[in-house]
Amino acid sequence: KRQVQAPPIIPRMVEAPVVNAPPPPPLLRPTLRFALSHPAHFIALGAGSGLARKAPGTVGTLWAWGMFAILQPHLNDAGWAMLIGLGTLVGWWACTVTARHMGIADSGHIVWDEVVAFWLVLWLVTPASFWSQLWAFALFRLFDAVKVGPMAWADRTFKGFGPRGGFGILLDDFA
């Protein structure tokens, strides 16, 4: 009779998690690949408008203005209210996820806050001529850059990663 030996018991080598691993370096300038890698990234980066090398917030606001011009003839007040409300809720999630994945609490490349807030501004001033909308654009960008009063408070108070930070990204533009 031939005896079959059981294979020797080999302990499985499992790599222990590194507790104090440094976080990955922050993603200072997102790429198109990053924007397309997750739906939240695409939304938070304003369908790619936030990928601009210079003044991504301004480019995102211009994209919002263009989308407003396209959508405005097709939406009534209830439609705009729903779009802005849903855009805010989805944006909260998208900005939270994207900020965490980028490793930057409020990257200038995250422009969904400009998009939804500028839609609100344009909706509130409608009907408005092109020149009135241009003034609204200029004032919106000025107040976004300067951040005085309630905008400064929101910007200081709601920082960090997680839902609170995602909410803060949106709130300073609504203020």
Regions found by a protein language model. Name each.
Residues 47-48, 68, 137-138:
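Extended, non-catalytic scaffold segments that flank or surround catalytic motifs
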Residues 2-10:
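Extreme N-terminal basic, low-complexity initiation segments
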Residues 52-53, 58-72, 79-80, 87, ...:
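Short Lys/Arg-rich amphipathic alpha-helical segments
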